[in-house]
């Protein structure tokens, strides 16, 4: 690992005092893996507080500036409309941006952007806007979704706006996807994913994380399996792919939110495990050695580092491990180095978005301990810094990329080794409606031996609206299973009343070929047949269930296609396969139990009217982890619905909300612990936004919501618990509260 390029005395000063370093001083304060170097791309005053970026076809950077985020430890001024979307350009060709244009200003905490056709999607909570681009100026503004990011704090709102290979736009911290069709915007339900940042691999599978988990991801393509709202989760989605959450900062990290807690820091006062994991990136640039291809890099701004993970596939499942122990791909001794997002670049380098500031913890959960750390080293200001770096092989000339506009030249780029270029070529063909290239695209489908090229050609045809059933049928027999899976996924776009019987016959042939790798995909896609012939789909459903009764991925895929008919199919399958230990029966029981939990019959309008402030607090503070239905969200938090922790002793509930809860917790006879949930609920004792009455109302609200029916909580109840435990900093454990 390349060492620090500054003397020991300067290192000690940087660690002790956290001074504001210039970009030229910041790079020598970093360690990067041997064989690589960090290069400056942009810095203040050209850019301020960046949180996300997109590259256009000219290699320019479109960046989001979230200038209003946490101006001080209580967030005063966060609602000032000072956020911007800017365009950065390197006009002299030296690799460093030297020109800035403001495309859009007066935004309140903007958080994501996406270039598409002749416009730009911009996420400005609660809205998602599409803004036409007229010669680099903002034109007509169209509201795409007024509830893109409703409520929640800045750490827990949707973001990402990733253009998937399947021509849909996906998000983190969201269960929605979007697509532009002519002048219309389509919105569909998808699986809930992640917290901050989202990425995809060469075949379009998605990867994400939450603040305490290194990497989560999907085994299957994102378009599938989100049709049955009764399923709390579908096997193969939101999988904990790298279970090792250790981090290895190169400086003491006492300035983390719970640095006071035992086990949070090691003996050298360095963070032990992720606490702000974000911005995952599947590296697809083709510039690094082949060993780095589809490695996943993860940012950790609290520990001032970027981690590298290596993935390994086994069938359709994926698991990974950290690339090495005891060190990181990139780390800094500069406390203000805050990598919050990572991107593949047109040149194949990794681009690091550095918010460069002292405060990154949002006020809702900011502890008094961290406030003192911030004050001790003067981390509140400045607020106008920001950097973009790129990591590239040391000494290697990295050339800027200008995308061609000729249709055939773009088709030729679908085989480029750089995934960013392939994606951009596909997007430009689709955005430009270049249907003249369909012969060349179909030639790729028939003749190319490169599975990545085949998949891009297929999805380009789909994006242009000219994919035909005849295009995908041969791909069902392709030697590469990912091509077969992609073709089965694309079937949703081409199955109609004329060809669904042929598709059903293809599914039977796939079953006969013992193609277990695509078994979940044919199960998911029964809904395509059911739209035209439900009895035919039902027969296939039973045949697949009988063939794969102990495959939980197939089981959940099948259940995803039978919303509101779960009991009927469960009785049928139990008659044929009575063994309750089989995966198909276990997954049915799980889904039916979730359905039962949701049958509360509560009058939500009446409850919201009775507790208006509580309804607002729940939406902003609680819903992002515990869900609208109170049944919890996978990888984040356990249920509140029918939880004895909620409906039981109100003093314990108040203590949890004020001081937090850490470690395993049992709800309805099920033990919830990391990685199924985050492993910690932060307390609200130090919140400047919520008083005792707000907390009392909110606890009354959840004790009487969903299937819960317990007594209310008063302001006096909250005060008594606060007086009992005072300024305790440690969160409770479940065992401690049982005493």
Where are these regions (language model features)?
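Electrostatic cytochrome c docking/interface patches
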Residues: 590-618
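The canonical Cys-X-X-Cys-His
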Residues: 342, 353, 388-391, 614-628, ...
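Structural detector for internal amphipathic alpha-helices that build alpha-solenoid repeat scaffolds
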Residues: 397-399, 422-433, 452-466, 471-477, ...
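Beta-propeller domains with acidic blade repeats across secreted/periplasmic ectodomains
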Residues: 1-409, 430
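Flexible coil segments in periplasmic/lumen-exposed cytochrome c-class electron-transfer proteins
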Residues: 3, 14-17, 599-609, 667-739
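Short inter-helical turns and helix N-cap capping residues of alpha-solenoid HEAT/ARM repeat scaffolds
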Residues: 417-418, 449-450, 479-480, 514-516, ...
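Amphipathic alpha-helical scaffolding segments comprising HEAT/armadillo-like alpha-solenoid repeats
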Residues: 403-412, 434-446, 465-477, 497-511, ...
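Sequence/structural segment immediately N-terminal to covalent heme-attachment motifs in c-type
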Residues: 608-633, 647-659
